[in-house]
Amino acid sequence: MQKDAVNDRAKAGIFMSFQNPISIPGITVENFIRTAKSTITGENVRALSFKKELKEKMDELSFDLSYAQRYVNEGFSGGERKKNEILQMSILNPKLAILDETDSGLDVDAVRIVSEGVQRFHNEENAVLIITHHNQILQKLKPDYVHVLINGKIVKTGDASLVREIEEKGYDAYKALA
């Protein structure tokens, strides 16, 4: 899969958000997501129905509709960039969403909004993998599984209670297992 082009991965139903999403000058958020959706589905995305869906999803994320006409992530705060990634995920509706440090640098309100966006998205037909070093987002999401990864190796797996154990012991307690 690593050798596949990004658009092939997207067509296969894989979405990846990044810790520090890049800006794309000259491309509006609306145009970017609509083009991505069209490319992934292989169908022409009708403007009117797309605008309705975009507004609905932006409202859910407390994201002002004016951001749809701004260039992707240009001048966005860290929280706005993360909300934009959750917006993309919710509209593109992948089978697997990999969220890399989605909670990094977010204030309490932004963590709540992003967490709620992930909860609305997640269902029995998709999966969400959250990569994080902090437990704040995990407390809100209540993960089914928690894995501790040290030096590229999963050294411990558990349920949501493992988050509390990590909080108490710290990651150093797991380094010997690697």
Task: Enumerate the language-model features and the residues they cover.
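Walker B catalytic motif
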Residues: 98-102, 109
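Helical segment within the ABC ATPase nucleotide-binding domain
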Residues: 111-124
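ABC ATPase NBD Q-loop/coupling interface
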Residues: 1-9, 73
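Conserved H-loop
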Residues: 125-141
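Catalytic "switch" loops of ABC-type ATPases
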Residues: 19-24, 133-134
